[in-house]
Amino acid sequence: MKVLITGGAGNIGSRLAASLIRRGDQVVVLDVNSEPLYPTPEFSKADICPGGVDDRELVMATVAEARPDSIFHLAAILSGGAEKDPDRTWRVNLEGTRNVLEAAVAAGVNRVVFTSTIATYGAGVPEPVNEHTPQWPSGLYGATKVAGERLGVYYHLRHGLDFRGVRLGAMVAPDAPVGGAASAFVCELYAQAVQCGAYRFDVYPTTQLPVVWVDDVVHALVGLHDADGEMLRHRVYNIAAGTPSVQAMADAVVRRIPDVKIDFVPDPVRAPIVDSWPSAMDVSASHDDWGWRPAFDLEQMTEQVLHELRERDAEPGRYI
């Protein structure tokens, strides 16, 4: 199978590319960054096309030339970056998504898999949120992702494109996502604890939010892509692995690095964005329809992310 990944050099994309190449797929990466955030021997086998999804001509030409069987559309400006640069966010998240969908239809691509977010739900909705919960986001990032979901459904209804997507909880990984996610603290905590011995949260310790380990996200994307369409009741599915408080995340690190110094100074912009998101996601549909389950809970993902960070420090030059 031949696959194109937009945002394929990013946190999720670089691991997804490696996973697909490992199983024998041919991968084309379209990304403004040519160097992967998570380098692997497998990623070096991907074909790299530098550029952004907001460049319509480039997207149309890249998809037409590559003729992929499927597209994983991951490229986006994230929540924190969206509030700082609304115009670019509109171009990348809205026009970019439309460019990808148009290119897919024009080139006869079979399937597009899209990454959405818990930020699409907003505040004041019944919890835990499920696939039927109304989406009333309070931030621009969430608003653009709702629009992206609905565009995908439109292209499914209008053009027969097999559009599928995942709504992700806050993703835990060794590197904070490029582009300024409001939830970047769930990654920064671990890196700063290992490298600096201290971390200052910009949200409240009582804040609760669904989290998910990056490799569980990759497994979800591949699993949803490969799933029998006849078994799918939804176009977009919730993906998360638990709902710890920020204090619980900090405590999990302190248990492993007892001398780490952690404090809390909530940011007046970021903290309200994060607090507007639901504190719990119902992911039962993902399990019931296509068998996805998270392999990592909070304790396991804490162990894994600290292991990867220490391994990185032990191998200079492995990470760029």
Where are these regions (language model features)?
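Glycine/proline-rich active-site loop of Rossmann-fold NAD(P)-dependent oxidoreductases
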Residues: 146, 159, 172-187, 214-215, ...
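A conserved pocket-lining segment of Rossmann-fold NAD(P)-dependent short-chain dehydrogenase/reductase
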Residues: 83, 168-178, 188-212, 216
